[in-house]
Amino acid sequence: TGCGVLLDVNNVYVSARNHGFDPSAYLRAIPRHVVREIHLAGFTVNRFDDGELLVDTHNRPVWPAVWTLYRQAVQRFGPIPTLIEWDTDLPELAVLVDEARRADAILEERHAQAA
């Protein structure tokens, strides 16, 4: 159709963990030209006797593994607009600002590489 795609990196990570696929391979399978925005968020881990289930809840900081996957996404798709989603259990403003600064730093790294 030619329309752009919003890539939810946290959802890719959560789904990969829950369903047993490689999130990096998933990113590599997406054509470079289609991703126009990236979303990041935190997730909740629900533990059970027989394992765990990650839930894309948007109520926690971005996990380190998601930051790593985000860096891979920015390398692949370029420094495109990024939104950090945090819907419930909002922290202090300083925490939100820190998350935004971390995303900005990764975008700036990519800008510097392109220059």
Model-assigned labels for residue ranges:
Residues 20-77:
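Gly/Pro-rich active-site loop or hairpin
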Residues 66, 77, 81, 96-97, ...:
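Rossmann-like AdoMet/SAM-dependent catalytic core
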Residues 8, 38, 82:
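Conserved, mostly hydrophobic/aromatic
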Residues 1-4:
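Active-site acidic/histidine proton-transfer and metal-coordination neighborhood
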Residues 93-114:
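C-terminal helical cap(s) of enzyme catalytic domains, especially alpha/beta-barrels
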